[in-house]
From Swiss-Prot:
Residues 16-79 form the S5 DRBM domain. One of its GO terms (molecular function) is structural constituent of ribosome. Keywords: Ribonucleoprotein, Ribosomal protein, RNA-binding, rRNA-binding. It comes from Anaplasma marginale (strain Florida). Transmembrane segments: none annotated. Belongs to the universal ribosomal protein uS5 family. The gene is rpsE. InterPro entries: Ribosomal_Su5_D2-typ_SF, Ribosomal_uS5, Ribosomal_uS5_bac-type, Ribosomal_uS5_C, Ribosomal_uS5_N, Ribsml_uS5_D2-typ_fold_subgr. This is Small ribosomal subunit protein uS5. Part of the 30S ribosomal subunit. Contacts proteins S4 and S8. HAMAP family: Ribosomal_uS5_B.
């Protein structure tokens, strides 16, 4: 009996792109000396407005990366994009000593962002954005600050609801 199996390409986890943000060797001091392991930070996105970040720790880098990718897939959030290329409005957020300022940009601007913030926008699918890191540039703090900023963002529907207007009125006033 032959079973006609379809490929699992329809599953959304195969459509995700992942970028390694940082790899650190960390140690735990035990009675016999130090135990070394690797801590990996990864961002995962579908390049259509969904993004997640995750951290994994293991004695091997490859295993730590697998753990980080699984954690990132579980923590994915939706970010509303304007014209599928930039943010709807400017936003800033703080996490620990890192503060990030994210600004929407005109067509053709590109991703003007440093370090780990650039990785987030690449997997998110943003083409035009300006970002500034103020304070600590520790990749972990910066990534979590960016995600805090994403959670502070409002969709056009939410903005229209707050202003008691229609969505079309909010969008055309840009």
């Amino acid at each position: 009996m032959s079973v006609d199996k379809k490929p699992r390409a329809a599953h959304d986890s195969h459509d995700l792109s992942e970028l390694l943000v940082s790899v650190r060797r960390v140690s735990k001091v035990v009675k016999g000396g130090r135990r070394f392991s690797f801590s990996v930070l990864v961002v995962v996105g579908d390049e259509k407005g969904r993004v997640g970040c995750g951290m994994g720790k293991h004695a091997e880098v490859s295993e730590a990366k697998i753990k980080a990718v699984n954690a990132a897939k579980k923590s994915m959030i939706r970010v509303y994009l304007r014209e599928s290329r930039t943010l709807h409005h400017d936003v800033e957020a703080k996490f620990c000593a890192s503060r990030v300022v994210l600004r929407s940009a005109r067509v053709g601007t590109g991703i003007i962002a440093g370090g780990s913030v650039r990785a987030v926008f690449e997997v998110l699918g943003v083409q035009d954005v300006v970002a500034k890191i103020i304070g600590s540039s520790n990749p972990h703090s910066v990534i979590y600050a960016v995600f805090a900023a994403f959670k502070n963002m409002l969709s056009p529907k939410q903005v229209a609801g707050k202003r008691s207007r229609k969505v079309g009125e909010v969008i055309e006033n840009r």
